[in-house]
């Protein structure tokens, strides 16, 4: 009986090794065919395309291209015009920012104008103090003067912008 015992042990060990090898093979096969349903669907779709003649496909592509081509061109033109408009807007905003920066640098900390108009005429603020109504009128005149200067500067900026745009158009033409 002792002689049969080692042979049974060898048999059980061999059976366990075979079982492990079989489980490994099943796992490998499982991984190999896991994508099989999707692969079948893809291949079935390819077969459908193979059933349609090449001339029919070419005609359908040409028809589709003719149908949507003008719309694509229209969208591209719109996008190009929008980009040009945005570029002009950016240039205008840059010019306005430069103008505002120049204005800010012209004014001192107390709010009086040190700009191009300050040397003209007399400065009535230093001559004599004004009463209530005259002070109010002087303030209104100063505000109107500032508004007019701002308008002149803005118009000058617009003229410079138009000149730049005209130069760009002439260079492109």
From Swiss-Prot:
Presence of the UniProt keyword Nucleus in the record: yes
Q: In its keyword annotation, does this UniProt entry include Cytoplasm?
A: yes
Q: Which UniProt keywords apply?
A: Centromere, Chromosome, Cytoplasm, Cytoskeleton, Kinetochore, Nucleus
Per the UniProt entry, the disulfide pairs are none
Question: Which InterPro entries does this UniProt record tie to the protein?
Answer: DASH_Spc19
Localization (cell): Nucleus; Cytoplasm, Cytoskeleton, Spindle; Chromosome, Centromere, Kinetochore
User: What's a GO cellular component annotated to this UniProt protein?
Assistant: DASH complex
In Gene Ontology terms, what is a biological process of this protein?
protein transport along microtubule to mitotic spindle pole body
Principal subcellular localisation of the protein: nucleus
* Subunit text: Component of the DASH complex consisting of ASK1, DAD1, DAD2, DAD3, DAD4, DAM1, DUO1, HSK3, SPC19 and SPC34, with a stoichiometry of one copy of each subunit per complex. Multiple DASH complexes oligomerize to form a ring that encircles spindle microtubules and organizes the rod-like NDC80 complexes of the outer kinetochore. DASH complex oligomerization strengthens microtubule attachments. On cytoplasmic microtubules, DASH complexes appear to form patches instead of rings.
What this protein is reported to do is described as: Component of the DASH complex that connects microtubules with kinetochores and couples microtubule depolymerisation to chromosome movement; it is involved in retrieving kinetochores to the spindle poles before their re-orientation on the spindle in early mitosis and allows microtubule depolymerization to pull chromosomes apart and resist detachment during anaphase.
The similarity annotation says:
Belongs to the DASH complex SPC19 family.
Q: State what protein this is by name.
A: DASH complex subunit SPC19
Instruction: State the taxonomy lineage.
Output: Eukaryota, Fungi, Dikarya, Ascomycota, Pezizomycotina
Q: Gene encoding this chain?
A: SPC19
